[in-house]
Amino acid sequence: MSSVVCPGSFDPVTLGHIDVFERAAAQFDEVVVAILINPVKKGMFDLDERIAMINESTMHLPNLRVEAGEGLVVALVRSRGMTAIVKGLRTGVDFEYELQMAQMNKHIAGVDTFFVATAPRYSFVSSSLVKEVAMLGGDVSELLPESVNRRFREKMSGTS
């Protein structure tokens, strides 16, 4: 059985992330979306909210599950008996950074990384940019799954 981890903070999960999850789910028997917690960063959404948003947005992917983790991605990968990571790439800048990470992960833990080129319609989308544009009054609804957009608007208006 081929299994892979898709790591990230997903704060919030975007349609670009969902695109990568769908494509990974089509290629691998099992996809684990690993929400990695950075104790230094205060996220917009807490861990439970992120898990719920990804679960709601990926119900159509029966071979995908969501987990939380801390520390090195490769430690999580190895602890699950897996050997691979999938990362989405938006631009050449992403590639340069992710290639270094992939080489380090292979060196320290023997973990392979598979890259998925982000669909062109999402090549500019990041969680950070979505938050920034929304905070400045821009409409980001076409960049988020519907259920995520609803929670996002509630959070932005202070009603959640």
UniProtKB/Swiss-Prot annotation:
Protein name (record): Phosphopantetheine adenylyltransferase
Top EC group: transferase
Site features described as Transition state stabilizer, chain residue numbers: H17
UniProt GO cellular component terms: cytoplasm
Cofactor(s) it depends on: Mg(2+)
Pathway in which the depicted protein is active: Cofactor biosynthesis; coenzyme A biosynthesis; CoA from (R)-pantothenate: step 4/5
NCBIfam families: coaD_prev_kdtB, cyt_tran_rel
Pfam families (UniProt xref): CTP_transf_like
Organism: Mycobacterium leprae (strain TN)
Keyword field: ATP-binding, Coenzyme A biosynthesis, Cytoplasm, Magnesium, Nucleotide-binding, Nucleotidyltransferase, Transferase
Localization annotation: Cytoplasm
EC number: 2.7.7.3
Molecular functions (GO terms): ATP binding; pantetheine-phosphate adenylyltransferase activity
Family according to the record: Belongs to the bacterial CoaD family.
Entry's Gene Ontology BP terms: coenzyme A biosynthetic process
Name of the gene: coaD
Subunit record text: Homohexamer.
Entry binding sites for substrate: S9, K41, V73, K87
Reactions catalysed, as given in the entry: (R)-4'-phosphopantetheine + ATP + H(+) = 3'-dephospho-CoA + diphosphate
Binding locations of ATP: S9, F10, H17, G88, L89, R90, E98, Y122, S123, F124, V125, S126, S127, S128
Role played: Reversibly transfers an adenylyl group from ATP to 4'-phosphopantetheine, yielding dephospho-CoA (dPCoA) and pyrophosphate.
